[in-house]
């Protein structure tokens, strides 16, 4: 058995298929963080604890983790993608919520990111005099996509024969996927590749952008071709 999959991506020209053996897409997790302050009128900040200022300090500190705590030879990404707090200009609110996203290629680096988030959030809350402990919930955890080298080499050979110069090595990308959950659970080797979807790929919006609308052609036909070619590498007569 072998597991095959693909995903349209903005970092390749339309019609190009990109493979990569070994670690391909990063593992990831997200964190929902709620911190507490003490609400008060905006004209009397000394009477409260400002959770917006607290959250801002957390954001600043979190963004030093990759540059100051992770080995420069390792890949890591930490992004604060959302911060929510308050409803009025003249009211210091009770709480602030942050949403954090991380990426890494090894469990060790991922664990260091997780530990740093906990340490920094708890430390900043203590420094601010927060009236209660923060809540940190980790979610949306996706494993590393590690393409089997033998499977990938075989599929890449089929792509080279069929697509010629439009088959390339994509290299590692820091996006993440749940694709590997099923083959990992079944103990089945797999490969997952990218498919270009935009003629103007250098200015293409990223995945999950509301403007992400791949060119219908040649993307649709090339996607169908790629799946057929990859499957045929395993199903046609003479395949090992």
Feature locations, PLM:
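Histidine/acidic-residue-rich, glycine-tolerant segments that coordinate divalent metal ions
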Residues: 1-82, 87-93
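Metal-dependent amide/peptide-bond hydrolase catalytic core
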Residues: 53-240
